[in-house]
């Protein structure tokens, strides 16, 4: 048997030859101990040059490709490739893991960097988005993540001189990042004119915002901020791969093989050209450089490491060499010396000294080398080449002996015969050639039996035979030297092989897994002396097997280090070492062999620590004679806990099914019943597959679990309390060491752990997100702060939690085999143990990971299955109980001894003060001393010991014990049979609680007149239970077979029981003795019922699809009901005992007449009239409504009707108990729903008086007793469950504002499209007309400076002649006229005691001073702000949070985000990027001000809680499937908040990281209905007020509606505000002003009395969107974009802010001489604004939407163009209409006075411009018009002489017309000579540069040239204002851009004197005034 066990010897990695120089950079450093750290393959190497020693870090599972050194230079971070790559932070001194960072990146980790103090680490992924991620590496926690770039990133670094700043570079880019909150925001480096845009390979940050970077062309680029300021050209002649900053300066290394040293200001110090040194060679390329003091380390592309001493820089010292890039396949060992030979595709053959660990010879060949061999005397070295040739060298001087080329394909293997006469050469073309060595390698034979390429060869010891392996896995033997194939078995038997390197053959069968035919083992080598075999495979693993190894699937020891294919492996000549070589990592590993005899002394080389450890699960180092598993444990390991449907899937399933439901629910659904039930008592305890799940609390109550319920049992009062927070089976339970807190873990797709308080039964924290399928073990740490949990997924994931915060601290894959227990070390909180099938593992925490070591059994025993474990009295000691009844005693990871404790498995053990207690399958509890030497006392659990006070009966003696707990003088015991017993220390046993044993429970019957019930189960027992307060099992009887149904006779004396074998029996109901039994059927008896009245007949239904009817008195079968097509599920009698109703598995509802059983067809109408004795049917019209929407995935299994026929209780497959009104007609009836059972509810029955409902859980084996609570008697305590479907259909009415806000879709700026329906080719893509100069053939710039030709006239008439023209260099936002009230709420607040107000419009936050009207702005948002709130906590004064729209495809800058900022200095304190798609619609601070709540606009309306200062997301959950308008924290809480929205109000609690919600309950008030809720406010004692769409305000106590303030307003209540200082509440609604009413009301704290305020706005309806209360003032924001201050005393209104109500604001005109301007908008108003006074002076209501507006040249008249085609001229002085005219049907787009005031030009969307002569008076007759305009008119400009007009049209064409004739002017030369009065055109060569590259879908919408004629501003569809020089004929001209507007700037103008720019917004209905900053003289 030993042949299949793992060998007991060991390999230890001693040396690695190589360094990874290819595809990596910056991966070589000095540590603080002056050692050198680098990596090769999958191993981190720490090399000490002084001692010439290597240490290895082996925590990675694949190629390492990046490395960073911690600033203190002891810790190293390394990143690897792979599907789930991770980062390890490790100690270079001890080479132990300190932290593991995982679960974020994919593909690989390309770069790493520590920040200045080493607290944070940044990593860059290899995924398509090159994700950048910042970690708090000690905690293993990701702080922030963002997409890095679309192309590869090569280097990243923290700016060591500025906090929270980073720089990254790569393919054609450099990016400067800032980290704020959880947001990483990049700015691209601007190359500008200073240097070419190119790939940057490396960088270093310096002081004063300087960054130095190395470019691909060998230049160094120097950056200041984000701008390139200079380049150092030709620093290297080719790409600069590495840059290293140190105290003295910078070192750079490049592809040119040079190292350059620079001082701190980047002036060159010196250059070292490595190619010119003696070790140098052509093509040497530097990949990594590190400068420390007077030493420089250099790593090259070809895997060399040089050390250079600065003052002897021409003598670099080679400290490491390896093979260069190219696959490495050839390996041979010298037959007599400790030498190894390798040959590679890099064409070099190298000889290594295994003693000195050095390269001693190297020879370059002409071809890639694929195999090598040294002959027996060590003189010749034969090399097989990739091209099929063969070269033989002399070993001593590497001179060539012979070169032969007989083959065209690669030589894969060659070997000299043991006697040295022959050389066998195996080729890719499947032949083997034999050469005679003495005949100068003449070919003497050939073997041709193979059909595939030759892979391995071996000679026999006598050199007469050769064995080969080929690619198809065949093994063939040949006679030598002729090459004849040997087939005779006899001949084969006698062969002895000189070496064994073949992978096929009897001796190596065991190296292959049992059932695989794969070809992934590349090389083996047998060690005959040590009887071990070493193998190398494709997965980077080197394994040791016993040799010979005959049986498949042998056990082994495995060693990792190589990253991918290990191509070859050989023993050294004396078997001291194993040499292995890596194909892709081209490294050579040298392993020391430690034979068995030395192992005894060498315990220190026990299991090696690693994340994927050597002695890993598959290596199963156990002996193969593991005892068979105990039957109980085996049964348990086969449980899967998988569900067809998980509870988490229900919401999605419901949504999918709702589509179908739409049609069905057009009818009104029946209301839910008034009655409720409450869980009262559960008979049952889950012992059959759980252990140690039963505890005493500190007050002596008992806590345990059954089904989905945590139970707290009071043994004095025999009562139970329940924790009902779980929704599926609980599998484990642990109790907190200090408090009465309990942790329970459940089954689920994403299963959760609930930590709850046994006193209040409230959840404290819910942990989820890291396990799958279920949680099988939990344990608290000794200080109670942490919790460990184990999942039941395939790798049994272990998670360590900080449970209060709900944070995952660490996670690791536990084991492939089932884990039964996890225990945390009471002395060291970072250590824990897990135990399970065949293993015991010791773990320690490393950052985000855990590192495990298997318990080391040594010679003491075998790896047994462990069922329980505890820690002892020191941190090293641990004890575990095995499946064979032993207790194992461990010190550290070593097994010290074993003690026999029980017969059969030890299931539970606990440590006491002075000893231990254990319990086992043998039903014995044993007490032990503190060293497990003596057993002090045993207690056997026997019926004889049962004390008189027991609540029930013991089913059998010595039941298997699964849980033990200790109390004062008592031991609490839980058994497999579902019993909980209390053992007194003196011996007597009291039974407290019991339930059925393992097996499904289906049969349930309640007694006709007593409070008792009977159950029968697959556990083969029939039990009678007392439902009265004594709650116990009265009687039990064992049956031969399990049973599925039972029924009491009407007189209660007999009990009929149907069994699973088709028989049934009748028993005496008191004694349970048999009366009579029958066996007429083969299949399960599924239902059994006595006929009502005297009980004359008994109907027996079976799965054979028959119902048999028996006469009870005569004991004869009198009838059979035939005709069912499927098994029978339910039967009911009618009240006369004449008719049977039958349900079948095929969902048929059938009727039979008794006693004969004749089938009857009864129309459904008649069925309702029949009076039934019982109703347990689930089919038929009367109960159509009990089938859920998701009926496809779940069956209703049982129902039962109350005797008053009012309430129908049902049970279903998902574990829900529901109550419906009866009859439940119509589909999908409303119900109340209760969760306690975990899966199928198999039966439900009301007791005889309907006072209780009894329910049975099938697989959870529990019997639950519920008490019924009728509506009237109910105290305020409400016991409806959360999910009950009791919502009403109506939502309280319709309101246009609410509907619009609900349906609005927010586009993000980046996706905005044209606001005008333009068509045609964009200007910058049009074919350009040649200019005058070009037409005349003049080369640009070549005109003579003095010319006879008249000078070209000015393009634009300059108005400020005489002044020096000063260009405008910047715009600063000075005023914003506008407020977003139309679809936001509660977004105007007081600050600074009411001196300032804060609000928002577009994407700016505005701080507005009430007294002066001055404004300051927060402009960091890059898109529209949707919500705003102010932190009320005094510690966070003036802190504001604003949320914006966005698009969350990835967490980039366009993601929706919340900014938290200081309102006074506008500093951003934190940015929270959300995964809410679309935007953030509500924000709220918690009471302490530390937490922030945000609500998303995504379809789930996700609610998220943040710790905003850290940028950490604490919790997140879908809020509701319809729009949530507001969510607010309770003003006194950090954990409670309320959300309101469409037909929804929810009361939330934050528990750890989980959000728990309760729906508002309406059931206590008559006729209350769930309306759409719009606002929320709070009162003391958990009162909540919500404003509704109908104008009512609902008042809630906790989550129950307690009253309604009817018609608080006459329309929707949009806003509510709670004043913290006095508790008064302000409400704002939508209503028409009336004498007594008002749109704003101030209420007392209880909302009983109020005072109304009217807003004197003159509107027909006032619609208030925001209210806030300060000292004696109320601040109101309205839908009409006004902000009004109302005095509380005098009710006086003061309008602070005005704005347009609806946009776009198309019309904009500035006064010719004063700082006034006009705006005209869709809302039908024209408004006059005063910039100096910062306010609106006047407004005119036109009654129609206005599109354009214009001042006359003198400023005395205003022309207004309307959307309906009309235009109006007003006199400015009186605002009287001077004239109006409507000649067009469509909108007027532009209107202009000519500079001489004579003409008015009117441009419309009818592709025309009309001219009117104003001198003819106000009749306004059209004098002519322009024809042939190809599209609608956008803008027009007159020439300075009023004789021409330029027109821009909707097809991107500009035309010039003569005035007033309207004639089209086409002569370009003439056009070029026109001087224009104004320029607002977006078209024309002069403004070609304003069109950007990114305008496929969006346009430049407006432009305006300054009065000085040298500056130009534009507005575009993205909402940007841009400033250019004028003219700008070059494409993509340089400009400055200014953000602030929402998408679409509709118009823009300079004011007189170019003092300001005014811009008008489309979507934001706001006008912005920008101050122009002129360049100084």
Curated annotation (Swiss-Prot):
Statement: the UniProt record of this protein carries the keyword ATP-binding: no
Family under the similarity heading: Belongs to the WD repeat EMAP family.
SUPFAM superfamilies for this protein: NHL repeat, Quinoprotein alcohol dehydrogenase-like, TolB, C-terminal domain, WD40 repeat-like
Repeat as UniProt keyword: yes
InterPro entries cross-referenced by the UniProt entry: Beta-prop_EML-like_2nd (IPR055442), Beta-prop_EML_1st (IPR055439), HELP (IPR005108), Quinoprotein_ADH-like_sf (IPR011047), WD40/YVTN_repeat-like_dom_sf (IPR015943), WD40_repeat_CS (IPR019775), WD40_repeat_dom_sf (IPR036322), WD40_rpt (IPR001680)
Signal peptide limits: none
Physiological role: May modify the assembly dynamics of microtubules, such that microtubules are slightly longer, but more dynamic.
Keyword terms of this UniProt record: Cytoplasm, Cytoskeleton, Microtubule, Repeat, WD repeat
Compositionally biased spans, kind Basic and acidic residues: 1326-1337
Annotated spans, Disordered: 609-629, 1274-1299, 1323-1363
Listed GO CC annotations: cytoplasm; microtubule
Top-rank taxon, per record: Eukaryota
Biased composition range(s): Acidic residues: 615-629, 1281-1294
Name this polypeptide is given: Echinoderm microtubule-associated protein-like 5
Coiled coil, from the record: none
Subcellular location: Cytoplasm, Cytoskeleton
SMART domains membership: WD40
GO molecular function: microtubule binding
Tissue/organ expression: Highly expressed in brain, especially in hippocampus, cerebellum and olfactory bulb (at protein level).
